[in-house]
């Protein structure tokens, strides 16, 4: 029996020694890798490359797909507004033009364009309608915020 115990003890000692050697070799390689200037440079490059990806949603309000959809909506609303005004449906025309104004990235430039292209009385009526549409939009936003806050 002593030879079996000796064999098991020797085997356990060799396994423990092998584990220590393997672990120390891994620590040594990691130490060498971290001291390598090329590794540090690659690590910094990865961090820099990963950083804008994390901050991109904060800088960009909409993703490109939604932005394209908004542009299509904008052009459709302008066209519908023009058609309604040509047909004499001023109420619907103003509504479409104000919707286009609300989603436009540069509303001042669009207002200047409307001022040049629309008759003065139509442009003035459009200006009068804008605060009402903005107020309706704010009320809609407030009501949706209350719905989001409700736990039900």
UniProtKB/Swiss-Prot annotation:
Enumerate the Mitochondrial intermembrane topological stretches.
1-6
Q: Where located?
A: Mitochondrion outer membrane
InterPro entries in UniProt: MAS20 (IPR002056), MAS20_rcpt_metazoan (IPR022422), Tom20_dom_sf (IPR023392)
Q: Which UniProt keywords apply?
A: Membrane, Mitochondrion, Mitochondrion outer membrane, Transmembrane, Transmembrane helix
Q: What is its main location?
A: mitochondrion
The segments annotated as topological domain Cytoplasmic are 28-152
User: Its domain of life?
Assistant: Eukaryota
GO CC, alphabetical: mitochondrial outer membrane translocase complex
Q: Name one GO biological process term.
A: protein targeting
Mind telling me which residue stretches traverse the membrane in this protein?
A: 7-27
Membrane topology, as annotated: Single-pass membrane protein
Family of this protein: Belongs to the Tom20 family.
Q: What is this protein called?
A: TOMM20-like protein 1
Which source organism? Mus musculus
């Amino acid at each position: 029996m002593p030879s079996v115990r000796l064999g098991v003890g020797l085997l356990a000692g060799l396994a423990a020694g092998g584990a220590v050697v393997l672990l120390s070799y891994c620590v040594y390689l990691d130490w060498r890798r971290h001291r390598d200037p090329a590794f540090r440079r690659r690590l910094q490059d990865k961090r820099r490359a990963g950083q804008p990806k994390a901050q991109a949603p904060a800088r960009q309000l909409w993703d490109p797909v939604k932005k394209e959809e908004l542009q299509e909506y904008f052009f459709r609303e302008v066209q519908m507004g023009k058609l309604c005004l040509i047909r004499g449906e001023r109420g619907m025309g103003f509504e479409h033009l104000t919707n286009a104004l609300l989603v436009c990235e540069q509303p001042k430039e669009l207002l200047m364009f409307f001022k040049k292209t629309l008759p003065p009385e139509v442009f003035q009526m459009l200006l009068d309608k804008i605060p009402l549409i903005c107020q309706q939009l704010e009320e809609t936003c407030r009501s949706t915020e209350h719905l989001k806050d409700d736990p039900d």
